[in-house]
């Protein structure tokens, strides 16, 4: 996910995307805790995607 793509979305779309990413992060954390997660790098990728969405939301709030 690229920040430029996120900047083209509306605030409502970004909030929906953030909610989906947070749910995905929760599910991945549960899989990691139970030892079912094979691709541990996905946790890092989702965490960074969440940060990107939050950054763009902050930019839009300030503008």
Swiss-Prot record:
Protein name per its UniProtKB record: Large ribosomal subunit protein uL29
SUPFAM superfamilies, sorted: Ribosomal protein L29 (L29p)
MF terms (GO), sorted A to Z: structural constituent of ribosome
Family: Belongs to the universal ribosomal protein uL29 family.
A GO-annotated cellular component: cytosolic large ribosomal subunit
Pfam family name, one: Ribosomal_L29
GO biological process, one term: translation
Gene behind the chain: rpmC
Keywords: Ribonucleoprotein, Ribosomal protein
């Amino acid at each position: 996910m690229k920040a430029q793509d996120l900047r083209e979305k509306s605030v409502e779309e970004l909030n929906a995307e953030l909610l989906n990413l947070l749910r995905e992060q929760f599910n991945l954390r549960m899989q990691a805790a139970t030892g079912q997660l094979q691709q541990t790098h996905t946790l890092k990728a989702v965490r960074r995607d969440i940060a990107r969405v939050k950054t763009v939301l902050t930019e839009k709030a300030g503008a």
